[in-house]
Amino acid sequence: MTITKAHALIALAAEAVLPLADCADPTSSSNGSNGGASAAGTSAATTSYDVSQIPTDEEIAALVPAEVKARGILRNGASADYAPAEFLADDLQTAQGYDVDINKALAKVMGLNDGTTNHAEFPTIIPALGTKFYVGISSFTITSERVAQTNMISYVEVGSAFGVAAGNPNNFDPTNPCGTTIGVQTGTAQEDYATELSAQCVADGLDKITIIPHDQQTDITPKVTGEQYDATFADSTVIGYTVTLSGGQMEQVGEVVESAPQV
């Protein structure tokens, strides 16, 4: 999760709820949101982690800024198109996922009434911290650039993986992606990594990778299954979940790479 320097007390609250990450359903449901997309355009049964029994930590609650305490709400910004971490239910309004449940649990520890999650395009979340949102829990890979802007508290380590249409009809080779077309979400670590791979291809005298960024990860899946893109590159959790819900239309190729702490 990412938080502004002024709201660093959330780091303390995070310590109290991190064990939930080990037992929460990765398709858990939570609070309302606007925008985003349902997971891979398919339905999946979801079960929210029950945070009702999580006690308030009075020491932490005493540190909550007056503005946050007055609202009684821990406002989270997330790109609600990145299942199973954060995505929308079939009503296209209700945010769900393990990051969403973590935010609700944090709110309980801080003595607040609720933790809400609203959709925002991924690159806009960090600039909105401290104004529109109090916290950003949205599958951020920790980088030096992001740490310069926010405090970042990791509670999970996630890698990256490639997803292709079932049967890999375009013969995408994850060990040699030069000359291919790859869809990524804008502003992600995968976009940066794919850019580095493409530069290496050119340096080696090979064709560059055509990298096509999208604001929403869910927009990429039909491009892959329709063979417009050779592959998509995303968090390994996202690729695995997309494959599971794709009804046999998608598969993962290659190993998980670039495993890193995430918030």
What are these regions (language model features)?
Residues G32, G41-G136:
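Extracytoplasmic small-molecule ligand-binding "clamshell" domains
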Residues L112-N113, G130-S139, T225-A234, V238, ...:
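Alpha-to-beta junction loops
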Residues I102-N103, T124-L129, D219-K223, Y229, ...:
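Short, hydrophobic alpha-helical packing/hinge segments within bilobed ligand-binding/sensory domains
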Residues L20-A37:
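Bacterial lipoprotein signal-peptidase II cleavage site
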Residues A83, A95-K108, F140-T143, G159-Q216, ...:
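Bilobed "Venus flytrap"/periplasmic-binding protein-like clamshell domains
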Residues M1-A21:
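Sec-dependent bacterial lipoprotein signal peptides
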Residues G115-N176:
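Acidic, polar ligand-binding/catalytic clefts
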Residues V156-V164, T244-V263:
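Periplasmic-binding protein-like
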